[in-house]
Amino acid sequence: FGDRKEFQILPSAVVEIPTLANLIKIKAGIISNFDFPTLNHLRIENPYLSPLAKIESNNQMDIFAKVYFITKSNILISLKGGYKMGNNDYFYTLDKNAGLNNMFTLVYDNTKTTYAQLDLAYQIDKKIDLSLNLLYQNIKTTDLEFAWYKPAFKANLLFRYNANDKFSISFVPSFQSKVKCLNPEGEVEELKSKIDINLAANYNYNTKLSFFIELNNIAYQRYFNYYNYPSQRIVLMAGAKYAF
């Protein structure tokens, strides 16, 4: 009864090896996962997604190796590399049924991805937090010409200063390499790489009430997260949060 579903086995096995007095740890294995993205998750990722887009499940198998290094000065360094096989991964493309070319839909394809990831984290006296994330990925699709809107390289930096329990300042720059997409005529286009630099300050009045101010895209760059949707060059936001 109903649609016929394919039965799948998704294996997972991970081995972790501590070495050198636990300063270095090596982890390797296979991790499989099944995912059915919600409309809310997709809407946050792409606010211009059509509510009529067909959402399907997907699964991945990740074969990886990871090395952790923790220094005596409280610096965490993590290097990970691997190979992912994706079944029915989703990608965004313009919805041909949208007359103004201002909405997106989902297309699906199987993928094979080679990737490398570097993470650094450092904390000084619980006042300064510094973290860096670098990701390189080479995504090969089966039927699609390219992996739409998927960059080959991403970099994220976070610097946060906690003056005390109430006040903190954050500096958050990021970089993303160019991506490929389809225009309304079905032709391949490239969206240029982007640099986004943000500043934020937060003040906790008490455990329930806090105030914030954010200054986004201070690099004053006009970039496109999605086709036909340019960013604002500078965005200032201020407000308050209250937890009930």
Where do the language-model regions lie?
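Exposed, low-structure sequence patches enriched in small/polar residues
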Residues: 2-244
